[in-house]
Design a protein with these regions (language model features):
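Non-catalytic cap/lid and distal C-terminal segments of serine-dependent acyl enzymes
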Residues: 1-171
Length: 171
């Protein structure tokens, strides 16, 4: 686990030696628990040390987890590599957080404020841990089913954070 300890975030992005990093986590003070996430880095990220990249947050469906977009699931690496190599998209960082069955929203009773954690803890953490272009114009959120609902909800409620939202069969 390459995660900084609670309260130990640095301003220097960490070094990574592989593109797909499935076992990342951090402690959320808002939710009072560990939050797992997977990361897919572009090939260029490993071969040079100064470039910055846009970020796409990929949200899973009901019953899924941070591995749902990984090699044994929807395989975002295969899709991203094909689209990058044919020039359809540029190299990007993909972040796949564990969303539980939260719809990526705050609970009505305030007992599980997932969206608050996402905006106030996860996004800033990613901008510190990785070489991101920390700007809403370089940040997107997408998801399928429950994650599609979450992607549309998060971006519509936080246009200061995301410039693109994609809901794939949002439920």
């Amino acid at each position: 686990d390459n995660s900084p300890s609670e309260g130990e975030q640095t301003d220097t992005p960490e070094l990574f030696t592989k593109r797909y990093n499935p076992d990342q986590s951090f402690y959320s003070k808002i939710l009072g628990q560990e939050i797992k996430y997977s990361v897919l880095l572009p090939q260029e990220y490993l071969s040079e040390s100064t470039g910055k990249y846009g970020v796409v947050f990929l949200l899973h469906g009901w019953g899924g987890n941070q591995s749902s977009w990984g090699p044994s699931g929807l395989n975002i690496q295969s899709i991203a590599d094909a689209q990058t190599s044919n020039g359809s998209i540029r190299p990007l960082i993909y972040i796949m957080p564990e969303g539980f069955n939260s719809y990526f929203c705050n609970r009505y009773d305030g007992k599980f404020n997932y969206m608050d954690m996402f905006i106030n803890e996860l996004v800033p953490l990613i901008d510190k841990r990785f070489r991101t272009t920390a700007s809403k114009t370089e940040r997107a959120v997408a998801g399928f089913s429950m994650g599609g609902f979450g992607a549309l909800s998060i971006a519509s409620q936080h246009p200061e954070t995301f410039s693109v939202s994609i809901g794939l069969s949002p439920s």
